[in-house]
C-alpha cells in the first residue's frame, strides 16, 4: 500500500475521547504533561493541544519557552478535523491558556465543533491565579474567559481566587463562595466545582464544593502540606475521566480528590519535586 493512500484513508484515523487544551512542559508534571498520562491510565484516548510550551515551570532557576503562536494554535485544532480524528470525541478540557487570542480561537473552534457533537462535554479550568500569588496570567485573560469560554462550558473548576475574579464577588467564606458559583450557572453551565475552598485548618482538611442549580455538596479531604505543582491539572484530568467513565458528578469529584492525594503521597515517598503517577487501582 502506498504511503499516499495510507495517510489519506480517513477510516484509519486515530480517534480521541478527549481533547485536552493546556500547557505542556519538557521537564515536569504540570498541564498536559501530567493530564495526558493520567487520562490514559483511565483507558481513554486523548489528544493534547499545547497553549504554551515551556522547559519547566518558572519555579526553577532557569526557564525557557512561551506561548504557542496563534497561527500554530489554530492549526493544531484545525488539523484534528482535517485528519478526521474527532468522530468519537466526547469531551474537551481546557487549562492554562497562553493568550486571550487563544481563548477566542478555541471558542470559535468549539462553537463549530458542537454542530457535529451536540452532546460534547466542555470542562474549563479557568487558570487565572490564586490567593497567595494573585493574578499570574496576562491581565486580559479573565475577561476572555468570561466572554468566550464560560458561555460554552458545561462545567468549570475555579479555585476561590478565580471564582472571585470571574464573578467580582467576595468568596472567602463558604456561603459567599456558593452564592458566587450559583451566579455563574446558566442553561449551558450546569455545575461549578470550587477547588481549594475554605477548609478546617485545625483538622487539616480542605474542601471541594460541587455547586449545581439544585444541589450543593461539600467534599472534605485531608490536607497535604506540599509545594508540588500540577495537582489542579491532575484533579481535572481525573474528574473528566471519571465523568466519561459514567461516574456521577459528586462521585467523580470525590474520586478525583482521593487520587490526587494518593499521587501526592506517592510522590513524597519517592522524594520527587515533580508528581509521579502510581498505578491506578481498579474502582
Curated annotation (Swiss-Prot):
<dbReference type="GO" id="GO:0005524">
    <property type="term" value="F:ATP binding"/>
</dbReference>
<keyword id="KW-0479">Metal-binding</keyword>
<keyword id="KW-0862">Zinc</keyword>
<dbReference type="GO" id="GO:0009443">
    <property type="term" value="P:pyridoxal 5'-phosphate salvage"/>
</dbReference>
<dbReference type="GO" id="GO:0008902">
    <property type="term" value="F:hydroxymethylpyrimidine kinase activity"/>
</dbReference>
<keyword id="KW-0547">Nucleotide-binding</keyword>
<keyword id="KW-0808">Transferase</keyword>
<comment type="pathway">
    <text>Cofactor metabolism; pyridoxal 5'-phosphate salvage; pyridoxine 5'-phosphate from pyridoxine: step 1/1.</text>
</comment>
<feature type="binding site">
    <location>
        <position position="231"/>
    </location>
    <ligand>
        <name>ATP</name>
    </ligand>
</feature>
<feature type="binding site">
    <location>
        <position position="125"/>
    </location>
    <ligand>
        <name>ATP</name>
    </ligand>
</feature>
<comment type="pathway">
    <text>Cofactor metabolism; pyridoxal 5'-phosphate salvage; pyridoxal 5'-phosphate from pyridoxal: step 1/1.</text>
</comment>
<feature type="binding site">
    <location>
        <position position="233"/>
    </location>
    <ligand>
        <name>substrate</name>
    </ligand>
</feature>
<keyword id="KW-0418">Kinase</keyword>
<dbReference type="GO" id="GO:0000287">
    <property type="term" value="F:magnesium ion binding"/>
</dbReference>
<comment type="subunit">
    <text>Homodimer.</text>
</comment>
<dbReference type="Pfam" id="PF08543">
    <property type="entry name" value="Phos_pyr_kin"/>
</dbReference>
<feature type="binding site">
    <location>
        <position position="195"/>
    </location>
    <ligand>
        <name>ATP</name>
    </ligand>
</feature>
<dbReference type="InterPro" id="IPR023479">
    <property type="entry name" value="PdxK"/>
</dbReference>
<feature type="binding site">
    <location>
        <position position="136"/>
    </location>
    <ligand>
        <name>Mg(2+)</name>
    </ligand>
</feature>
<dbReference type="InterPro" id="IPR004625">
    <property type="entry name" value="PyrdxlKinase"/>
</dbReference>
<comment type="similarity">
    <text>Belongs to the pyridoxine kinase family. PdxK subfamily.</text>
</comment>
<dbReference type="GO" id="GO:0005829">
    <property type="term" value="C:cytosol"/>
</dbReference>
<feature type="binding site">
    <location>
        <position position="59"/>
    </location>
    <ligand>
        <name>substrate</name>
    </ligand>
</feature>
<dbReference type="InterPro" id="IPR013749">
    <property type="entry name" value="PM/HMP-P_kinase-1"/>
</dbReference>
<dbReference type="InterPro" id="IPR029056">
    <property type="entry name" value="Ribokinase-like"/>
</dbReference>
<keyword id="KW-0067">ATP-binding</keyword>
<feature type="binding site">
    <location>
        <position position="162"/>
    </location>
    <ligand>
        <name>Mg(2+)</name>
    </ligand>
</feature>
<dbReference type="GO" id="GO:0008478">
    <property type="term" value="F:pyridoxal kinase activity"/>
</dbReference>
<protein>
    <recommendedName>
        <fullName>Pyridoxine/pyridoxal/pyridoxamine kinase</fullName>
        <ecNumber>2.7.1.35</ecNumber>
    </recommendedName>
</protein>
<feature type="binding site">
    <location>
        <position position="157"/>
    </location>
    <ligand>
        <name>ATP</name>
    </ligand>
</feature>
<comment type="function">
    <text>B6-vitamer kinase involved in the salvage pathway of pyridoxal 5'-phosphate (PLP). Catalyzes the phosphorylation of pyridoxine (PN), pyridoxal (PL), and pyridoxamine (PM), forming their respective 5'-phosphorylated esters, i.e. PNP, PLP and PMP.</text>
</comment>
<dbReference type="GO" id="GO:0008270">
    <property type="term" value="F:zinc ion binding"/>
</dbReference>
<keyword id="KW-0460">Magnesium</keyword>
<feature type="binding site">
    <location>
        <begin position="221"/>
        <end position="224"/>
    </location>
    <ligand>
        <name>ATP</name>
    </ligand>
</feature>
<feature type="binding site">
    <location>
        <position position="23"/>
    </location>
    <ligand>
        <name>substrate</name>
    </ligand>
</feature>
<feature type="binding site">
    <location>
        <position position="162"/>
    </location>
    <ligand>
        <name>ATP</name>
    </ligand>
</feature>
Amino acid at each position: 500500500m502506498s504511503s499516499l493512500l495510507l495517510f489519506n484513508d480517513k477510516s484509519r484515523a486515530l480517534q480521541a475521547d478527549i481533547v485536552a487544551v493546556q500547557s505542556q512542559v519538557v521537564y515536569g508534571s504540570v498541564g498536559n504533561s501530567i493530564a495526558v498520562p493520567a487520562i490514559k491510565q483511565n483507558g481513554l484516548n486523548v489528544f493534547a493541544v499545547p497553549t504554551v510550551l515551556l522547559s519547566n515551570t518558572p519555579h526553577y532557576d532557569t526557564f525557557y519557552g512561551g506561548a504557542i503562536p496563534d497561527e500554530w494554535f489554530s492549526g493544531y485544532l484545525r488539523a484534528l478535523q482535517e485528519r478526521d480524528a474527532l468522530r468519537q470525541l466526547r469531551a474537551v478540557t481546557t487549562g492554562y491558556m497562553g493568550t486571550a487570542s487563544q481563548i477566542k480561537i478555541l471558542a470559535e473552534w468549539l462553537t463549530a465543533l458542537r454542530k457535529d457533537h451536540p452532546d460534547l462535554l466542555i470542562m474549563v479550568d479557568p487558570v487565572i491565579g490564586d490567593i497567595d500569588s494573585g493574578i499570574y496570567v496576562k491581565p486580559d485573560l479573565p475577561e476572555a474567559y468570561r466572554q468566550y469560554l464560560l458561555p460554552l462550558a458545561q462545567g468549570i473548576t475555579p479555585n476561590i481566587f478565580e471564582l472571585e475574579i470571574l464573578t467580582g464577588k467576595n468568596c472567602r467564606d463558604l456561603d459567599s463562595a456558593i452564592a458566587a458559583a450559583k451566579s455563574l450557572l446558566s442553561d449551558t453551565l450546569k455545575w461549578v466545582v470550587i477547588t481549594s475552598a475554605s477548609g478546617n485548618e485545625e483538622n487539616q482538611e480542605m474542601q471541594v464544593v460541587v455547586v449545581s442549580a439544585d444541589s450543593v455538596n461539600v467534599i472534605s479531604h485531608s490536607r497535604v502540606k506540599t509545594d508540588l505543582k500540577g495537582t489542579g491539572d491532575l484533579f481535572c484530568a481525573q474528574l473528566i475521566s471519571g465523568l466519561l467513565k459514567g461516574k456521577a458528578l459528586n462521585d467523580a469529584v470525590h474520586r478525583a480528590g482521593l487520587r490526587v492525594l494518593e499521587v501526592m503521597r506517592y510522590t513524597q515517598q519517592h522524594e520527587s519535586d515533580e508528581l509521579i503517577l502510581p498505578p491506578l487501582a481498579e474502582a
